[in-house]
Structure formats: C-alpha cells, structure tokens
Amino acid sequence: MMISVGFVHELAVLGSGLGSPKRRQQCCSVSMKSPTAERVGRIAAGVCISAVLGLSVPTDVLAKSSMRLPSKPPETNAQAILLEAVPNCPAWLREAGLSVSSVTTEGGGNIRSSGGEVRSSKGLKSWPYIEKSTAKALDKLGGAGLLGSLDGKDRDTAEARLEDAKKALRAMKASAEKKKSADVISNQIIGLRAMDDIASIISMRSTTPRPVPDEFSKLPKLFGHADVELLVGYKTPSGQPTKGKVLLELDGFSSPISAGSFASLVKDGKYDGLKIKIEDEVLVETEIPKQASPQSIPIEILVQGMNSAEYGTSLEEAGLFNERPVLPFNAYGTLALSHPSNDLNSQGGFFFVKTDPTETPAGLNLLDGNYAVVGYVIDGQTVLSDLRAGDSIVSAKLVGGVYDFI
C-alpha cells in the first residue's frame, strides 16, 4: 500500500513526468491548530514532497526512517556541510569551520536579524556566543605548522587563504562586539569560503578522484569545489524589476559526474537565459538547458563511509535505505539535478529546495537518496527566495574555488 500525506499547501513537482496539478491536489491538507499538529505536519512534509515528486513511499517508511535518525541534530549550514564532506580535511580546519558556522541559525531567506536591520536567510545566536565561537576558531587557525604538508604554489595559495580566513574572523568578532548583524553574516561566509579553499587544496594534493563506472568515464567530471555565480533577473517583493546574484558551491569530491556536468554546462553558457519554470514555497526549478549532443547523467549519490558513489539507482533500490548521503537535503538552497520519476538517469535541469531546514527532521527527508545533490547556495539565499516562475538566469559563470576538470 502506498501513502501520500499532505502539508499546508500544494507542493510543486520537478520536471516533466513528475506529476500533475490533479495529483498534487490529492495530497490532503493538514490544519495547523496546535503545536502537536504542526509537528506532525512537519514530519509528514518529508513524505508528501516525495509523494508528489513521483517517488514510491511505502507505508512502513516512518518505521524504517526512524532507524536513520542521527545521534545529533543535522548540520543545516551549507558551507559546513561542504567542508565536512572534503576528504582528508584536517581536524583543526574542520573544527574551526564548525565553530564559525555554529553562530548562525539557518532559515528560509526571510529571517530578520537580531538587530532587525537586515533581511537574511540566517539568524544569529547571542553576541557573547558569537564572540566566543569566533575566538575559538581563530585559536584553531593560529597553530604552528598547519600547512606543513604543502609546498610550492599550493603552500603559497593556502597561506594567503589562511590569512583571508583569519582577517574575516577578526572582522566577524569585531562586528559582533558592535552588534552589526549583516557584517557578522557576510564575514562568516567569507571566512568559511577561505577555509573551504584550504581544505580543497590539501585534499586534492593528498587524495585521488573517486572512481566512476567505465560507462560514464567520458562524461565531464569535477575534482574539488567550484564556485558558480548566477546573475538572475527578477522582481522584488514590491514588484520592481531588478537583478541579483546567487553564489553556488559545487562539490566535485562527492559528486564528480553530477557536479562536473553542471559545471561544464555553466562553462559552455548553456544556463544563460534559462527561465525559472516552477516556483513555490518548496522549490525553484529551471528549464532544461539545450545541448548540441544531450547526454544522460546518471543519478549519483555518495553514502557516508564509502569511497565511491552509487550510480543509476536510488539508495532504497540499492538496499541502502538506512544509510545517509554525504550531501543531504539539509540546507536551504540545496542544489540538485532533476529527473522524471520513471528514469533516474535522464538529462534534466536543476532545482533548489527552499524549505526551512528545521521543517523536516533528519531521517524523514525522503529526497535524500532519491536525487543527486550537486552543491548548495552559499550566498544570495534572499535572492533565491524572491525568484518566481518566468524570472530568468541572465548568466552563469565559474568564479572561484579549487578544482580541476578531469
């Protein structure tokens, strides 16, 4: 028996063949009249999203999913997720990054900061906590011999990025002392980007790319982390035409083919001019980019603790239902490749998930293991929250990161 449980609104579906308005309307609404009802509705949301996306949802899914619950709350900061996913990331760097990422709470693009002066996707913890966590991170970055495994140009680049990280953290601490919310958030992003670059340099010099099946060897592959800037044309909440930037980070360590294919299309200008096809409270999806020679991109999901990803199948179909992906749908602005429900290995567009990460508890997000996550929005979440169907991507370009095409 299959179930379809609804949340407070209709959910959009991804890609051709993933569903219809009639099917979406079949999801029953849950009236939020009490905290208990709201909590049940939030748990149900994970099931409903998957149901309307055309995924099979067995009746025992909640019992199975309880086996997947982690021992700690899931990480919802996109940059922290990416840093933790870097192979061979040094402990001092990971710990510094987690200290920095912990000062904000991640939301859905419309949080007002504690000072009230900025619209943001992040909320701030207490000022004393921010100062303490930033000081702890600076202490981790101030140790001796941290980059001893590197030499030559790699060493020079890593040392420069280490100074960039420390500069951003000092500015972050000073901003907290002055209670400047926007400056804390902007310097957090800058500092974590610098730390991610250092981790990527170390990893790319100490590890090899993850193996991929021979049948996919000719597809573009990315090794490392690449930053992509989307310039989008849209209207503000007041209706004024404007343009804004959304910064993405692609993870070629964990999803070499998916991220590589996305980055290759960006490099070739295939996303320039694409329209936003679907937008609602849950997701934003683009049109499918036109290619001279379309290639099928297999679904690609790396499971925690494994050296190579699963290809061509969902985790449930692979018998890995209880395993957790390295790149989960935990963060606002998770970027994934779309595909029809009846073909996990077809060429598709991409979509962003816009749900508040606190709305779906860990272990109950049924998008995990059914779609290939490519990366995350690391800046510009408020622009993402303003996008509507009919808006467009003016341009997409690679703007930074540490990566190679292989």
PLM regions with names:
Residues 21-23, 32, 38-41, 63, ...:
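Short, intrinsically disordered low-complexity segments
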Residues 36-63:
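Single-pass hydrophobic alpha-helical transmembrane segments typical
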Residues 26-27, 47, 88:
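The N-terminal extracellular segments of secreted preproproteins, especially immediately downstream
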Residues 23-24, 44, 85:
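Secretory pathway export signals and precursors
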Residues 60-406:
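Cyclophilin-like peptidyl-prolyl cis-trans isomerases
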Residues 1-37:
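N-terminal chloroplast transit peptides
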Residues 10-13, 17, 52-54, 61, ...:
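Acidic/proline-rich low-complexity IDRs
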